[in-house]
Amino acid sequence: MATTSLASAFCSMKAVMLARDGRGMKPRSSDLQLRAGNAQTSLKMINGTKFSYTESLKKLPDWSMLFAVITTIFSAAEKQWTNLEWKPKPNPPQLLDDHFGPHGLVFRRTFAIRSYEVGPDRSTSIVAVMNHLQEAALNHAKSVGILGDGFGTTLEMSKRDLIWVVKRTHVAVERYPAWGDTVEVECWVGASGNNGRRHDFLVRDCKTGEILTRCTSLSVMMNTRTRRLSKIPEEVRGEIGPAFIDNVAVKDEEIKKPQKLNDSTADYIQGGLTPRWNDLDINQHVNNIKYVDWILETVPDSIFESHHISSFTIEYRRECTMDSVLQSLTTVSGGSSEAGLVCEHLLQLEGGSEVLRAKTEWRPKLTDSFRGISVIPAESSV
């Protein structure tokens, strides 16, 4: 390929040279010939040889044309060299390594922790962890062939305008991974009562196999036209039933129910929170993880500096729309920065209707073994 292009370029150069006069020189312009006409009769002697300015000018090559041809040759060579060197490169396995467990029902996906997923303490946040869980869950549904038109909807669900909505999520974090780490998310689904679906997750360190995070999420069906909850049709049950496993990552007794909170009992309140276009998912529904961002808006920075979230329970009570205006409320209990903290959260519409309740438990960062580095000074306080 490169040889062919070079030959073509040289042929172009030859054609240009042949277009010149018989001596291979491009004739000068008529204007130049007129200016040199009188000089033809007046020849100078240089070293005993007659010298004509006109003849000398005719013998000079057209350097601009020569430069253009050389540029064409090198451009063609560079292009062909690039084509020969480039080859499609497979995706790194740690980024898109999807596979199933021994029984074909436990889905696994690996994630490399990116620089934009870590914070000032060099570890990931609870939001980054939940993003990995959500991505693994959707790819699980896609891999088993039950992903229809939308996030997590089957074909029969799409026919009936049904979607899954999360009712409750509980996350327990033992350790947060750091930038450059690779984690593996295991996920599987099971039944929860007669009309619910349970999604369970384990997050492991790919190097050690250590369990970093356990999560369970309960979903129910909602009709997108009526915006009301719906029973699971038998046709849908037939689609999802074969993928169910009777196993849990977190037992129900481990989950602590969030407590009621109101304006008078809250320590911190922030209003004026509104959904944006980028907060909506493919189902035209506010992404569940966006609610977590709103909840944490009212947690003081001093807590983030000194503590990690060790567990997170969130109960969704109603959805919000693009024109909703919300308030985030938080109350803190637990004492000094050396001890664990508990926060109760409420997200409500400005009119007072509850959107969700949540509870977060926090442990001091000093108790974490983070590569042998103490990231928070001992004198820090809440």
From Swiss-Prot:
Q: Which gene encodes it?
A: FATB1
Q: For this UniProt entry, what is the primary localization, expressed as one broad class?
A: plastid
Transit peptide as recorded in UniProt: 1-83
Full protein name: Dodecanoyl-[acyl-carrier-protein] hydrolase, chloroplastic
Q: Which family does it belong to?
A: Belongs to the acyl-ACP thioesterase family.
- PANTHER family from the entry? OLEOYL-ACYL CARRIER PROTEIN THIOESTERASE 1, CHLOROPLASTIC, PALMITOYL-ACYL CARRIER PROTEIN THIOESTERASE, CHLOROPLASTIC
- Cite the EC number: 3.1.2.21
The entry's active site is 283, 285, 320
**Superkingdom of source:** Eukaryota
**Which reactions appear under catalytic activity for this entry?**
dodecanoyl-[ACP] + H2O = dodecanoate + holo-[ACP] + H(+)
- Top-level taxonomy: Eukaryota, Viridiplantae, Streptophyta, Embryophyta, Tracheophyta
Q: What does this protein do?
A: Plays an essential role in chain termination during de novo fatty acid synthesis. High thioesterase activity for myristoyl-ACP.
Assigned keywords, A-Z = Chloroplast, Fatty acid biosynthesis, Fatty acid metabolism, Hydrolase, Lipid biosynthesis, Lipid metabolism, Plastid, Transit peptide
Citing just one GO molecular function, the answer is: fatty acyl-[ACP] hydrolase activity
